[in-house]
């Protein structure tokens, strides 16, 4: 096998591979000899079928095996001898026409093909002491604990029917039937019977509860509302009416926050319940803080490290990103013009996102590898269990799918690897904690979550 480099440009490499006719004949004969010992053909004793006869019957299918074996061998040879790290699967192009393949099969001509691939970029990784990160943190205010306690107390609060003829007030619990319509026609999921609604809880569409206030048992009213723009795609932004019938109006009893309330929710004391609420809020703030500083860290890494990217990886990432854009548009029904842009401009913006994700993915993979970061199997297993739990009744199927598909399992491992890597970088960066309000922290976290993550482009 003769391998000659024909292109070395940036991250692109191309090679011409020639398999001499004699080599083809030898490989073909070797496989036919192996087949001879196994095949059973009427009229011939086991192991006595002439090789020439086998070649007439199976030669072309065996030739395909020979070619595949040669391709695999060439790929290994190219990567090992040139110490290359491929950025994806090599592309194989066969030279010549069908007649050339036939000549190779008859061992009267050499067999040639091309191998084209992109390699991973090489870049130097220094220390991270020059990276400065502002980390937002927030204290858990006692009023937030009390607010959540109040919500639990509301859930546990008793309601007593109001006197006959009494109108519903804010804070009352009403039992209603309703039929929702758009353009005068009922829509799927827009109707309900014997639905309990606490007026002022903001659990229904904005404007709905306010229009129920003042109604009495037995009264009907047509309520007009507009679905929020961020509602489900088929209903977002649409005007609707609801024909509402009030069946019961109940006034709230006294709200009690004591040990009995705590016991109703499985706690021994009110203080134990408060402590759990504080812990839950603290965990929520910590997760929000992490999202904020992680985004800031990735931004700094993206600015600090610039290197050539494999076009194939960028194209694949862009295709993934763009498919999501198209699906989002299908769900929302919005066009680029309605969003204040054009398809051309949107493509340019999302290509930058794809480039960022590939760059950060390659960078974090390299940093993690050099730092010796590994994700233990038990951590992957725990994450896989959590993923399976998201599909009740299909847990075993989900578990088996990931366990039998290493590429799919890497989708579970990659985010864990990324988190460990950014934690490692953070230990070396300059971090300044800044106390902010809950609202500011959650806003920053939401902005970070809405931005494009690196994790999908990361591989360990």
UniProtKB/Swiss-Prot annotation:
Q: Which family does it belong to?
A: Belongs to the FKBP-type PPIase family. Tig subfamily.
Q: PROSITE patterns in the record, alphabetically?
A: FKBP_PPIASE
Recorded protein name is Trigger factor
Q: Which GO terms describe its biological process?
A: 'de novo' cotranslational protein folding; cell division; chaperone-mediated protein folding; protein transport; protein unfolding
Q: Name one GO cellular component term.
A: cytoplasm
- The record's note on its domains: Consists of 3 domains; the N-terminus binds the ribosome, the middle domain has PPIase activity, while the C-terminus has intrinsic chaperone activity on its own.
Instruction: Give the residue range of the signal peptide.
Output: none
């Amino acid at each position: 096998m003769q391998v000659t480099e024909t292109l070395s440009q940036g991250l692109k490499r191309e090679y011409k591979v020639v398999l001499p006719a004699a080599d083809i004949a030898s490989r073909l004969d070797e496989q036919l000899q192996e087949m001879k010992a196994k095949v059973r053909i009427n009229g011939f004793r086991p192991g006595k079928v002439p090789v020439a006869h086998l070649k007439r019957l199976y030669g072309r299918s065996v030739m395909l095996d020979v070619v595949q074996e040669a391709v695999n061998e060439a790929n290994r040879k190219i990567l090992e001898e040139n110490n290359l790290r491929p950025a994806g699967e090599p592309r194989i192009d066969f030279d010549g026409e069908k007649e050339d393949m036939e000549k190779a099969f008859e061992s009267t001509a050499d067999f040639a093909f091309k191998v084209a691939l992109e390699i991973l970029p090489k870049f130097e990784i220094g220390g991270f002491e020059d990276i400065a990160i502002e980390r937002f943190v927030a204290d858990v205010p006692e009023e937030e604990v009390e607010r959540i306690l109040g919500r639990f107390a509301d859930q546990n609060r008793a309601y007593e029917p109001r006197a006959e003829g009494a109108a519903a007030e804010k804070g009352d619990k009403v039992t209603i039937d309703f039929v929702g319509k758009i353009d005068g026609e009922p829509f799927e999921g827009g109707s309900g019977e014997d639905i309990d609604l606490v007026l002022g809880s903001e659990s229904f569409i904005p404007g709905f509860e306010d229009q129920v206030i003042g109604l009495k048992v037995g009264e009907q009213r047509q309520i007009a509302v507009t679905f929020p723009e961020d509602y489900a795609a088929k209903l977002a932004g649409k005007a609707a009416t609801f024909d509402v019938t009030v069946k019961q109006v109940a006034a709230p009893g006294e709200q009690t926050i004591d040990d009995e309330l705590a016991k109703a929710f499985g706690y021994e004391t009110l203080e134990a319940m408060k402590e759990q609420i504080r812990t839950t809020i603290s965990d929520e703030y910590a997760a929000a803080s992490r999202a904020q500083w992680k985004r800031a860290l990735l931004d700094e890494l993206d600015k600090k490290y610039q290197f050539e990217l494999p076009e194939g990886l960028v194209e694949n990432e862009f295709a993934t990103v763009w498919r999501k854009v198209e699906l989002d548009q299908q769900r929302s029904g919005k066009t680029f013009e309605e969003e204040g842009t054009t398809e051309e401009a949107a493509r340019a913006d999302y290509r930058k996102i794809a480039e960022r994700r590939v760059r950060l993915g390659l960078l974090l993979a390299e940093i993690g590898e050099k730092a010796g970061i590994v994700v233990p199997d038990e951590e992957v297993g725990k994450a896989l269990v959590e993923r399976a739990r998201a599909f009740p009744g299909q847990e075993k199927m989900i578990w088996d799918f990931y366990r039998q598909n290493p590429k799919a399992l890497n989708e579970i491992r990659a985010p864990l690897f990324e988190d460990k890597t950014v934690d490692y970088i953070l230990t070396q960066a300059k971090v300044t904690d800044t106390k902010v309000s809950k609202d500011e922290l959650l806003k920053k976290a939401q902005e970070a979550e809405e931005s494009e993550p690196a994790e999908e482009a990361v591989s360990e």
